């Protein structure tokens, strides 16, 4: 067995993709994850790498990510199959030193490419690296059922959507005080939707793609998963509340401010006033 299969990052990706599939967020080949790795984390597994790594040109140059390593889910791959055959469904790649291409060093044993949303992932990684001082290393996308459902019936505006989720569960303001960003509906797998997502990622760790899914970022796979899980739980509660006729009482603005003070977070000001 290849040593890399027992690495923390392969095992972590197996756990994340399995959990997300069991949640019902990643039907068929839906969803994608990218994890930025450090050179020293990858180095011990070089003996498992391809002798002649395949080079693929990027549709959008990413010089800010030059020489960076990423573990990424494959395009057209099913999350439910990652734990059965990680080498077929995942890919370890390194961006070239000019940021114009990447080399596939491991994975995708049956051929193929990384996720079709790689442009969105890379653009979001660049922004989250900047705003987090390099601590954010994960971009995660999935089709979270109730967040998608709310996008059909709620105003697609950052502040009001954030406020709705904050009121849906007390922990939400603590977990994502920076709120949720929203992009217009756009064709997926394009540089354009990647640019729009990255712009929202500058202010928000969560970005909603209406009628499609959610993007989340964080330092670790657990953090990114937990962020989406928390928002999706609140969305599920609000879907049930709306189905029962709507709110009769809720968490007030003053209570949200008190909550933020207790947990020493700075809430999105526009959402407090929404």
From Swiss-Prot:
NCBIfam families reported for this sequence: PRK03634.1, rhamnu_1P_ald
Name this polypeptide is given: Rhamnulose-1-phosphate aldolase
Record key words, sorted: Cytoplasm, Lyase, Metal-binding, Rhamnose metabolism, Zinc
Cofactors named for this entry: Zn(2+)
Pfam families: Aldolase_II (PF00596)
Cofactor binding, per record: Binds 1 zinc ion per subunit.
Active-site residues (renumbered): 117
Pathway listed: Carbohydrate degradation; L-rhamnose degradation; glycerone phosphate from L-rhamnose: step 3/3
GO MF terms, alphabetically ordered: metal ion binding; rhamnulose-1-phosphate aldolase activity
GO biological process terms on file: pentose catabolic process; rhamnose catabolic process
CDD domains the UniProt entry points to: Aldolase_II
GO CC list: cytosol
InterPro entries assigned to the protein according to its UniProt record, in alphabetical order: Aldolase_class_II_sugar_metab (IPR050197), Aldolase_II/adducin_N (IPR001303), Aldolase_II/adducin_N_sf (IPR036409), Rhamnulose-1-P_Aldolase (IPR013447)
EC number annotated for this UniProt entry: 4.1.2.19
Coiled-coil ranges from the UniProt annotation: none
Highest taxon of the lineage: Bacteria
Subunit structure: Homotetramer.
Catalytic activity: L-rhamnulose 1-phosphate = (S)-lactaldehyde + dihydroxyacetone phosphate
Compartments, record wording: Cytoplasm
Family statement: Belongs to the aldolase class II family. RhaD subfamily.
Residues annotated for Zn(2+) binding in this entry: 141, 143, 212
Major location category of this protein: cytoplasm
Function: Catalyzes the reversible cleavage of L-rhamnulose-1-phosphate to dihydroxyacetone phosphate (DHAP) and L-lactaldehyde.
């Amino acid at each position: 067995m290849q040593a890399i299969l027992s690495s923390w990052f392969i095992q972590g990706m197996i756990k994340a993709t399995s959990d997300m599939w069991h949640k019902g967020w990643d039907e068929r080949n839906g969803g994608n994850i990218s994890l930025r790795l450090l050179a020293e984390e990858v180095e011990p597994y070089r003996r498992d790498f391809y002798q002649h790594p395949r080079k693929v040109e990027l549709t959008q140059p990413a010089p800010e990510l030059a020489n960076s390593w990423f573990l990424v889910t494959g395009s057209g791959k099913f999350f439910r199959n990652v734990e059965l055959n990680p080498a077929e469904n995942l890919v370890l790649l390194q961006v070239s030193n000019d940021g114009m291409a990447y080399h596939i060093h491991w994975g995708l044993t049956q051929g193929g490419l990384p996720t079709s949303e790689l442009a969105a992932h890379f653009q979001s990684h660049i922004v989250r690296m900047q705003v987090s001082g390099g601590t954010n290393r994960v971009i995660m996308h999935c089709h979270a059922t109730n967040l998608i459902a709310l996008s059909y019936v709620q105003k697609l505006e950052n502040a009001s959507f954030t406020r709705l989720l904050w009121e849906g569960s007390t922990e939400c303001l603590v977990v994502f005080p920076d709120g949720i960003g929203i992009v217009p509906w756009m064709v997926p797998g394009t540089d354009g939707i990647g640019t729009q997502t990255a712009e929202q990622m500058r202010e928000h760790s969560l970005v909603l793609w209406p009628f499609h899914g959610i993007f989340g970022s964080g330092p670790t796979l657990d953090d990114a998963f937990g962020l989406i899980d928390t928002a999706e739980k609140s969305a599920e509660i609000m879907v049930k509340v709306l189905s029962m006729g709507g709110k009769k009482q809720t968490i007030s603005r003053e209570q949200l401010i008190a909550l933020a003070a207790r947990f020493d977070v700075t809430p999105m000001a526009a959402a407090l006033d929404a």
